[in-house]
């Protein structure tokens, strides 16, 4: 990624915590209020993730990126030069790569790059991610993520 990405670790920490909540789904006590959040999807193969990306991008009104398998096993990433989301092979990496939160994160990178030209995890990325989450998982899931970002001091 070009430029300084000073918020990367904080965003990852907030999203990891949020993703763990989505793994369980259901009722969440949020500062005395009851929220109901969905259980995140887990895609069993690359085609299922591709289909999901197509649907989400249609929903938010952006052209869908290519989705391809990635050789490495440690992370997914977005390639701006080819508008490609690269996801580790779900069969060999286990379930983490096929989690909905991972795919939404990469969709947010795609959207942010198309609209702002940015690849960092700054304010524009977080705004895109919150919009994508609100549209796909609902406002309560987005509220939890926003609180995670705020708690991780993503200014």
Language-model features, listed with the residues they occupy:
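Active-site-proximal or metal-binding-adjacent scaffold patches in catalytic folds
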Residues: 1-101, 110-155
């Amino acid at each position: 990624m070009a430029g300084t990405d000073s918020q990367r670790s904080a965003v990852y920490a907030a999203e990891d915590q949020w993703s763990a909540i989505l793994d369980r789904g259901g009722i969440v006590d949020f500062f005395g209020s009851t929220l109901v959040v969905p259980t995140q999807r887990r895609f069993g193969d690359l085609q299922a993730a591709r289909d999901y990306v197509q649907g989400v991008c249609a929903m938010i009104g952006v052209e869908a990126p290519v989705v391809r398998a990635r050789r490495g096993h440690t992370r997914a990433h977005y390639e701006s030069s080819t508008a490609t989301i690269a996801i580790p092979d779900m069969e060999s990496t286990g379930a983490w790569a096929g989690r909905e939160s991972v795919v939404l994160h990469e969709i947010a990178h795609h959207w942010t790059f198309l609209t702002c030209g940015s690849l960092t995890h700054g304010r524009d990325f977080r705004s895109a991610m919150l919009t994508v989450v609100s549209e796909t998982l609902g406002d309560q899931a987005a509220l939890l993520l926003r609180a995670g970002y705020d708690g991780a001091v993503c200014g």
